[in-house]
């Protein structure tokens, strides 16, 4: 999981 993903408002385990 990437913490920066949640920064975009979308938490994707894939990205």
UniProtKB/Swiss-Prot annotation:
Keywords: Disulfide bond, Protease inhibitor, Serine protease inhibitor. It comes from the Eukaryota. GO terms for molecular function: serine-type endopeptidase inhibitor activity. Belongs to the protease inhibitor I3 (leguminous Kunitz-type inhibitor) family. Inhibits trypsin and alpha-chymotrypsin. Heterodimer of an 'A' and a 'B' chain linked by a disulfide bond. This is Trypsin inhibitor B chain.
